[in-house]
């Protein structure tokens, strides 16, 4: 963990804060404009304070290396430690260091995406039904270890389908749905 990794991680944590405020918010790089971050870097534990610019809602994230986790909740705490790992692992709060080598959120390739609510999920599932109702078409899959799933995580709302939005010069905005599958241990 270094100061640059933590700065890039703070942008990802802004997106997690937006999901904590509204689990069905559309996430894209413009969400960063709604938040300010304050980083207190330390080798053992780094505190990242994410504050909403309008309502001043504050969330404090404690960031640890995977080798030295000593988590104690603080005021306005997110509720779980954020852990920088050496390789990709299960868990919404575990980010591999290779995710943090570049500023992925500000990249032009960073997608716009949203969690589908139960009504939209039922609509997608009904569209996937074939004529006889016995077989269903399947959506492309994505693993729960992908950064999009880590951002959209909410403990009380299971994530089944993620909708991606892509701009197309000819057709306008295209949508692409993907189903989330878990990784076996």
From Swiss-Prot:
Signal peptide span: none
Protein keywords: DNA-directed RNA polymerase, Nucleotidyltransferase, Transcription, Transferase, Virion
Record InterPro entries: RNA_Pol_22kDa_poxvir
UniProt-listed GO biological process terms: DNA-templated viral transcription
EC number(s) given by UniProt: 2.7.7.6
GO cellular component terms, A-Z: DNA-directed RNA polymerase complex; virion component
Listed GO MF terms: DNA binding; DNA-directed RNA polymerase activity
Enzyme class: transferase
Entry's family note: Belongs to the poxviridae DNA-directed RNA polymerase 22 kDa subunit family.
Function: Part of the DNA-dependent RNA polymerase which catalyzes the transcription of viral DNA into RNA using the four ribonucleoside triphosphates as substrates. Responsible for the transcription of early, intermediate and late genes. DNA-dependent RNA polymerase associates with the early transcription factor (ETF), itself composed of OPG118 and OPG133, thereby allowing the early genes transcription. Late transcription, and probably also intermediate transcription, require newly synthesized RNA polymerase.
Subunit structure of this chain's protein: The DNA-dependent RNA polymerase used for intermediate and late genes expression consists of eight subunits Rpo30/OPG66, Rpo7/OPG90, Rpo22/OPG103, Rpo147/OPG105, Rpo18/OPG119, Rpo19/OPG131, Rpo132/OPG151 and Rpo35/OPG156. The same holoenzyme, with the addition of the transcription-specificity factor OPG109, is used for early gene expression.
Protein name: DNA-directed RNA polymerase 22 kDa subunit
Organism the protein comes from: Vaccinia virus (strain Western Reserve)
Upper classification of the organism: Viruses, Varidnaviria, Bamfordvirae, Nucleocytoviricota, Pokkesviricetes
Record gene name: OPG103
